[in-house]
């Protein structure tokens, strides 16, 4: 059994070894796995979810710029080029088609797209997979600046230290899907 509450602005890292139930818990929260538990969301909670396969769900026929332009709203629209540059898609890189991007580039693009969505709770399942050191640092900076709450699965202390307000070690969990 798990019973927890995520407070506004809290940034929680689920840490532990492979196979300890971190991603399973996330999949239960996201209703991707049947279970007997309940999830109660607070008033006006909007979840943005980054699954481990999120980068593969991007439209391969769009360019990097089009992918972000499609989701950006309001004041963000005037900052698209700056945001693309911050995620290492400046200049010509923003004109590349998604289908020619590397795994790390796709992951960066999928994460940037998620950060632009009008959500206030991010649930990220191993968001640093396929990212190089510079991309991880940029993601960490963006998540630190994010005003909403974050629950993320991570294996890398150098990433979650200084980002997470709380670190939940999953090594003592017993994860059973009933």
Please give the residue ranges for each predicted region.
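ABC ATP-binding cassette signature C-motif
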Residues: 1-178
């Amino acid at each position: 059994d798990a019973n927890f509450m995520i407070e506004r602005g809290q940034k929680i890292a689920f840490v532990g070894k492979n196979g300890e139930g971190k991603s399973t818990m996330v999949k239960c929260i996201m209703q991707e796995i049947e279970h007997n538990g309940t999830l109660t969301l607070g008033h006006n909670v909007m979840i943005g979810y980054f699954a481990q396969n999120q980068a593969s769900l991007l439209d391969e026929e769009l360019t990097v710029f089009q992918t972000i332009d499609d989701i950006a709203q309001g004041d963000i629209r005037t900052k698209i080029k700056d945001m693309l540059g911050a995620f290492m898609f400046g200049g010509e890189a923003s004109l590349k088609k998604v289908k020619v991007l590397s795994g790390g580039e796709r992951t960066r693009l999928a994460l940037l797209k998620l950060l632009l969505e009008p959500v206030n709770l991010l649930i990220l399942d191993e968001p640093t997979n396929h990212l190089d050191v510079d991309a991880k640092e940029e993601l960490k900076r963006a998540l630190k600046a994010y005003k909403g709450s974050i629950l993320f699965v991570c294996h890398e202390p150098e990433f979650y230290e200084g980002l997470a307000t709380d670190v939940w070690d999953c090594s003592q969990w017993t994860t059973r899907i009933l």
